[in-house]
């Protein structure tokens, strides 16, 4: 009987393993509507071996490989070129780049009007050049995932968009942006570049009022624990719910959370910090749905949003309609928005939506101390460090900030030895009871439930973020 039971037991274990993997978050700390993206889980590992813009061993080569794939790095530094992601089921583990991290000096984008989905990207810096004929200013986003879905962006540093920093315009849905740093969108009026904005999501069919069942939905967006600096507005601009904006910091912007497209859905806006800066006067919220008729199908839950605007408003606002000091200081709604849309007694329960992982909500009073040491891609480069310093000092301005040397304070190091080229160092494999000469054991299911390669890259990301509390990637100053 044993020879009959053994294959049955193995088949059962495989089914259980696949079931467990299907229920796992992108990584243990993943939250929000994009938390269940699996990326390249279960697929091949591709190693980036050079900093070329294309060709074998490049990042572009790695993400272009067929099937599910996890991309790791044995180099670190600057990649001069755009990155096109042709299809989903992809994990990019920027945290594996040894020493200096990875900066993409170009745009990261998926094909417009394609349903590219299931992508996990961590610890990458995206810093495109100035607009040109290929990327004119009205299309010049650092990250353009306009029609993508099921995306997790974690510890991303993005800057130098001339349209938005991150574009989710065309109905993109089921997306989390968390612990990321969006700074220095391009502002240069001498060239007509004055659209320095943050993140946008919309469902274009709402504009015609003729949405069909097969249209992209938009919404299902989580903006969690991020820092925005020097963006005029759209920090973020979300017109479609369900969506949530929780525990973010916005500095030196005009408008924080905004609608300015035809809107529909429910929104939780909780525990954010809006800090006035020197470039423009602050308006923490702007609800402008541009709907042609009422009632407008939107509703809002606002709680514990901290405003630092000396001379105008200093303190925590709940429902802005019920706060006389706030409503005296700011105009925040127009075009049919009514006070009764803000009358929720509790936050919207997004747990009814499949794949949603409720975020931990932290106090709005200590966001700077908690976020500034750990946000963005590790280690912080000179752009990130400057942005953080200007926020801390409450100075700086909108501009096209381009340091001559983006490698200041960043030191590439030698990658660990990986004999079997499965993305996991020999020493780590031995510690985990794996075989450093077996190139196929990266998909071994570990006690955590994750595959071995995921355990490795997840642990590395956690340790890098913790290290940032004590070291910001720069030499002592």
Regions found by a protein language model. Give the residues of each.
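Short, T/G/N/S-enriched strand-turn elements that build extracellular solenoid repeat scaffolds
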Residues: 37, 57-64, 79-87, 105-111, ...
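Extracellular calcium-associated, cysteine-rich motifs in secreted modular proteins
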Residues: 402-477
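Acidic Gly/Asp/Thr-rich repetitive segments characteristic of extracellular carbohydrate-active
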Residues: 27-71, 441
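Right-handed parallel beta-helix
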Residues: 79-216
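Residues in short coils/turns that link rungs of repeat/solenoid architectures in beta-rich domains
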Residues: 128, 160, 184, 229-230, ...
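Extracellular beta-rich repeat passengers
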Residues: 237-404
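All-beta strand scaffolds that present successive hydrophobic residues in beta-strands
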Residues: 71, 92-94, 119-121, 151-154, ...
């Amino acid at each position: 009987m044993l020879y009959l039971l053994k294959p049955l037991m193995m088949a059962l274990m495989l089914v259980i393993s696949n079931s467990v993997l299907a229920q796992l978050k992108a990584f243990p700390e993943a939250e929000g509507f994009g938390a269940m993206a699996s990326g390249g889980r279960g697929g091949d590992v591709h190693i980036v071996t050079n900093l070329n813009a294309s060709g074998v061993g490049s990042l572009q080569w790695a993400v272009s490989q067929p099937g599910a794939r996890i991309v790791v790095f044995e180099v670190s530094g600057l990649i001069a070129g755009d990155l096109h992601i042709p299809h989903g089921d992809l994990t990019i583990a920027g945290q594996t780049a040894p020493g200096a991290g990875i900066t993409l000096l170009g745009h990261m984008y998926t094909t417009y009007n394609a349903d590219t989905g299931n992508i996990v990207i961590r610890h990458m810096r995206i810093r495109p050049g100035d607009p040109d004929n290929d990327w004119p200013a009205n299309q010049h986003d650092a990250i353009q995932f306009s029609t993508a879905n099921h995306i997790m962006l974690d510890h991303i540093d993005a800057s130098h968009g001339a349209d938005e920093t991150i574009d989710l315009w065309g109905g993109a849905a089921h997306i989390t942006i968390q612990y990321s740093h969006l700074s220095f969108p391009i502002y240069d009026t001498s060239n007509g570049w004055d659209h320095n904005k943050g993140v946008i999501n919309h469902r274009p069919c709402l504009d015609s009022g003729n949405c069909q069942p097969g249209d992209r939905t938009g919404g299902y967006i989580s903006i969690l624990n991020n820092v925005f600096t020097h963006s005029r507005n759209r920090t973020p601009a979300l017109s479609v719910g369900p969506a949530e904006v929780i525990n973010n910091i916005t500095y030196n912007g005009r408008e924080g959370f905004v609608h300015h497209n035809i809107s529909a859905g429910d929104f939780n806006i909780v525990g954010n910090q809006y800090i006035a800066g020197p470039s423009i006067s602050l308006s923490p919220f702007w609800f402008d749905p541009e709907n042609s008729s009422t009632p407008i199908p939107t509703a809002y839950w606002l709680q514990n949003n901290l405003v630092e605007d000396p001379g105008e408003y200093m303190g925590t606002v709940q429902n802005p309609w019920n706060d006389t000091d706030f409503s005296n200081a700011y105009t925040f709604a127009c075009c049919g928005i009514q006070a009764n849309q803000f009358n929720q007694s509790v936050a919207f329960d997004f747990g009814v939506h499949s794949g949603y992982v409720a975020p931990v909500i932290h106090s709005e009073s200590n966001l700077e101390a908690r976020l500034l040491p750990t946000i963005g891609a590790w280690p912080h480069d000179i752009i990130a460090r400057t942005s953080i310093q200007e926020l801390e000092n409450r100075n700086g301005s909108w501009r096209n900030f381009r340091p001559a040397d983006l490698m200041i304070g960043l030191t590439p190091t030698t990658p660990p030895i990986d004999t079997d080229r499965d993305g996991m160092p020999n020493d780590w494999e031995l510690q985990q009871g794996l075989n450093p000469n077996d190139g196929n054991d990266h998909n071994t299911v570990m006690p955590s439930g994750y595959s071995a390669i995921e355990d490795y890259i997840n642990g590395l990301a956690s340790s890098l973020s913790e290290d940032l509390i004590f070291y910001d990637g720069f030499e002592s100053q």
